[in-house]
UniProtKB/Swiss-Prot annotation:
This is C-C motif chemokine 1. It is found in: Secreted. GO terms for molecular function: CCR chemokine receptor binding; chemokine activity. The keyword Transcription regulation does not apply. The lineage of its organism: Eukaryota, Metazoa, Chordata, Craniata, Vertebrata. It comes from the Eukaryota.
Amino acid sequence: MQIITTALVCLLLAGMWPEDVDSKSMQVPFSRCCFSFAEQEIPLRAILCYRNTSSICSNEGLIFKLKRGKEACALDTVGWVQRHRKMLRHCPSKRK
């Protein structure tokens, strides 16, 4: 009887799961979005690597990983960003 009760509770909870949950972002935990972008050029010597923002983000750009443990976002359409991208390596994925 306890197994049936547990199964019913699980079904009820699953039915209450919101349907507007963004399942894509749950599948790609390493992805990130940018909401503000660097207005001035970041010196190339300060950047370790870059990665693209996720395709599910409203703003497409690059996330630069900086040497002091910080990150900065930049629009991929800006000239200096495109030049830096050609000179840098892509950041390794943190996925296991």
